[in-house]
Amino acid sequence: MNVCFVGCGNIAQAMIDGLLSNGISTSSIACIERNQRKVELLKEKNLKVIELDNLAKENFDLVILAVKPKDALSAEKNIFQAAPNSKILTVVAGIELNKYSNPNSVIRSMPNTSSAF
């Protein structure tokens, strides 16, 4: 299974750590992140960091939307423009499915950072 995280904050990091500790290879996980400090940390974990424009080329089974709520709707639109057949799992708090541009292709989940423990 190939997974791409769009946004790699605390919840995404907890999910990535969980995937890695359960045997998912780093080669199966990619990240799209704007914060250069986080990009360096992701690369230290041997995770692939890609640009949104390359999303369609990578052929991911699942794209996990883990950005701040203020960025979620535009990020989701950009994901569908870059890779219209993407399945999206959103972990963004406070945004109902009907607010997304393609709500039938979005799955909503609400983990929290204590899930890491």
How would you label these PLM feature ranges?
Residues M1-L52:
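NAD(P)+-binding Rossmann beta1-loop-alpha1 motif at the extreme N-terminus of oxidoreductases
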Residues K45, L52-F117:
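Rossmann-like NAD(P)(H) cofactor-binding subdomain of soluble oxidoreductases
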